[in-house]
Amino acid sequence: MPEIKLTHVTKRWGKFYAVDDLSLDMEDNSFITLLGPSGCGKTTTLRMIAGLETPTSGQIKIGDRVVFDSEAGINVPANKRKVGFLFQNYALWPNMTVYQNISFGLGNIKEELPVIDEEAKALKSMIKALENPGELVKLIEECRDKKGKLDLDMVYLKLIDNYTISIYTAKELYNYKLHEAADKESTSKQKKQELTAKLDSILAGHKEKREELNEKFEVVSGGKVVTRVRKYSKEEIDLAVRRVSRIVKIGMFMNRYPAELSGGQQQRVAIARTLAPEP
């Protein structure tokens, strides 16, 4: 989270001052605890930062951006502030799986975003995985149960976590059936050559348009990253969900419902959902 700065922030309901002339600096990447008795304004302050409550007066700045200024008439809505807010009761949707709870908000975001060549990004990830066929096969074989049957959910999770890829790329990588090949080295080499040729063709296509891809696989034209107003793709949403699930260690619970989780596990899901927008 970038630096957050509150300057002379006041929140008043009638004659009651929930927050009175508060000035506060929160440094970039710092961990801040607001300590005080019930009713002193802790939650109100957090809600004002997130945009869920409108201050009576003052200024709130997140990073280099002023998100509220009473004198200038600025009040950026909550969904444009990129601030995660973890409610005290977790507020998980009981009818949604863990995956759906985390991804739900991401699917509603629509803003100016870089144009990304997702196919090229996935191809590069698979090529990298195929550079070490022994490691790839080992990861898959580790997912057999006592009867020798592969647990596909575990296979996908291992591939996702080890290669930092989406579920879609993990499934495609598994479907190459490298673990079943008689000559794994030759099969891996052949598949790698096919994918490399496909990637080269994509890069050549960008070159014809006088474009290139940067290290994030964002399309660059004229030295600038190309952007457009759009929603996150399924690939981007899945990568975001997998990223935060690794942080809080809930990757194995993606298909479960909140009622099937312990209180601590539900808390992790709520934290993951808060982190997913990547403020």
Description of each model-found segment:
Residues 96-105, 109-117, 121, 218:
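Short coil-to-helix segment of the ABC ATPase nucleotide-binding domain corresponding to the Q-loop/switch region
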Residues 50:
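Helix-to-loop junction immediately C-terminal to a conserved catalytic motif
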